[in-house]
Amino acid sequence: KAGYRNFDTAEGYMNEKDLGEGIKRAVHDLGVKREELFVSTKVWNSHRGYDKTLRAFDESMKKLGLEYLDLYLIHWPAVARWHDDWREINRSTWRAFEQLYREGRVKAIGVSNFLAHHVRALTEDGDIKPMVNQIE
């Protein structure tokens, strides 16, 4: 009703299910077309790495009730608290992002709060460059 069309959420915000319910109401009750919406979410630090990232994506999609995502972001660069080797965990997470993008499940992939050396490592290690670096 208010006209919002851009929704930025994250696994860590714990509101994906609520947003999904709002999107469902907008589409079904108000006639808003899914194509008119831009929805982004982010994978949390504890769900990093290839397999965990794919599972986290599926869970986010289930909560959001969507068939595709407009933008998927790695929420934070890996830090020692969560992972010993930041470059390797970013690389394996990014491989999962590239797969989701190639499969058409995500229209754009990127990162959030990454410093220049983190982005540089992804461009060196991956096939697809990050399309967005969302800075807090």
Predicted segments, located by residue:
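N-terminal binding-site loop/beta-alpha segment at the start of enzyme catalytic domains
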Residues: 1-37, 67
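CE4/NodB-like, metal-dependent polysaccharide N-deacetylase domain
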Residues: 53-74, 99-103
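Conserved, mostly hydrophobic/aromatic
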Residues: 7, 19, 39, 60, ...
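Short, acidic/polar
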Residues: 1, 49-65, 115-121
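Short helix-capping segments at alpha-helix termini
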Residues: 25-35, 64-66, 101-105, 125-129
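Beta/alpha (TIM)-barrel catalytic core signal, keyed to glycine-rich beta->alpha loops juxtaposed to Asp/Glu
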Residues: 76-136
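Active-site beta-loop-alpha junctions enriched in small/polar residues
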Residues: 10-12, 42-46, 74-77, 114, ...
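Acidic-and-aromatic substrate-binding clefts and catalytic sites of carbohydrate-active enzymes
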Residues: 10-18, 46-51, 80-81
